[in-house]
Amino acid sequence: MIEVAVQAEPDWADGTDWERLAIEAVTAAMRTTPHAAMLDAAYMAEVSIRLTDDDEVHALNRQYRQKDKPTNVLSFPMVQDDLIEGLDNSDDGEVLLGDIILARGVCVREAAEKGVPTAEHATHLIVHGTLHLLGYDHIEDDEAEAMEDLERVALATLGIDDPYAITED
């Protein structure tokens, strides 16, 4: 089973059901991977999502990635990707897959630039972050293409258009 714990700062209160959105995004992302069975596993896998401000994400980005600026999403995996397959053997029946942290200001700005609702862009970022928790990355071009393909599939199941499509104005 999967549990998605959402903590949203007050500036995220815009009428969106962030908990529902996060659960749907995490589930959609997981279903696109070989780890989909985790959704129905006997153990409880938890993903923690924090919706916060640019200042907090800036500080975390500086501390953990040595990048002195805010970013849209940070992911902090708690399970090494090569150990995910063995989670069925978890002693206590629970495992924290990791944390996903979104920056409100960056998310709102990027959504406006893309001409999409903030909730739609945040969904994409949560899908992206979930894939990072499952061991996917985009350092190399082939990894980036594979990860983007998974994102497209997950988002399509949620009725969200390809975020990487180039549109002509």
From Swiss-Prot:
GO terms for biological process: rRNA processing. It is found in: Cytoplasm. Keywords: Cytoplasm, Endonuclease, Hydrolase, Metal-binding, Nuclease, Ribosome biogenesis, rRNA processing, Zinc. The keyword Cytoplasm applies. Its main location: cytoplasm. GO terms for cellular component: cytoplasm. PANTHER family: ENDORIBONUCLEASE YBEY, CHLOROPLASTIC (PTHR46986:SF1). Belongs to the endoribonuclease YbeY family. This is Endoribonuclease YbeY.
